[in-house]
Amino acid sequence: MDVRHRNHVKVTGRAGGPVVMLAHGFGCDQNMWRLVVPLLEPDFTVVLFDHVGAGNSDLSQWNRERYASMDGYADDVLTLCRELDLGPVVFVGHSVSAMMGVLAAAREPGMFAGLVLLAPSPSFIDDPATGYRGGFSAEDIDELLESLDANYLGWSGTMAPVIMGNPDRPELGEELTDSFCRTDPEIARLFARVTFLSDNREDLAAVEVPTLVAQSSHDAIAPPEVGAFVHDRIPGSRLVTLNATGHCPQLAAPEETAAAIAAFAGTTA
């Protein structure tokens, strides 16, 4: 199997430079990083890819059993690292991909020079028993998934602007809506369940590689308490709160996002 084809891999930037691997979130593809990439290319080897089922990945490689949990995606990340053979990478995971990086690094820490967890959430669902605040009640998530199942395109048009934030810049929400609408609805329904129902809180403590937790100053999907929780649970991690708002700072504030990635990667890669 050619993983470069399967995951539509692109390698760009400075040959021989420290390696930064960028992983997109739900309903997106590698194009979400397009404003950040030119800012990283002068100093880093940049690896872009699409998760199987997203973007220009090989859809024939998608199957329900493998991608019904975060584990299948984490396995793909490790396979990419091995097959590309670029040495330890700084893995930058946005949103749900942050937890894929956590799982992958816990399994094979030698593959990673570090992790950047951008707008991460180990669980979107509040847990009153422990006091954990994920931002949504279980009922909220059930309603969200029911709405997605009933009318994926309609759900995309409603939710994308909420996820993106920045209501004064509606073009950002429109871009995310378009990205959602390009995703196969069947694949999106399953990936939404992986995204919104997974609970990776107990996996955080297993991370041993240098980690930067980067969160927006206001994010309707992952409130500040979530970033603080991730930082608290990953030993030795750093936490930075960006001035950016919304759940996709790589689009809303690419310069600030790239600067945070570069500052961290430059000290760990």
Question: Which residue stretches match the model-derived regions?
Answer:
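Acidic catalytic loop of the alpha/beta-hydrolase fold
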Residues: H218-A222
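Catalytic active-site module of serine/aspartate enzymes centered on a nucleophile-bearing elbow/loop
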Residues: S237-A269
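Conserved HGGG/HGGXW glycine-rich cap/lid loop of the alpha/beta-hydrolase fold
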Residues: H8-R66, L80
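Short beta-strand/loop motif that positions the catalytic acidic residue
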Residues: V207, V213-Q215
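Flexible "cap/lid" loop of the alpha/beta hydrolase fold
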Residues: V102, A106-R107, M111-A150
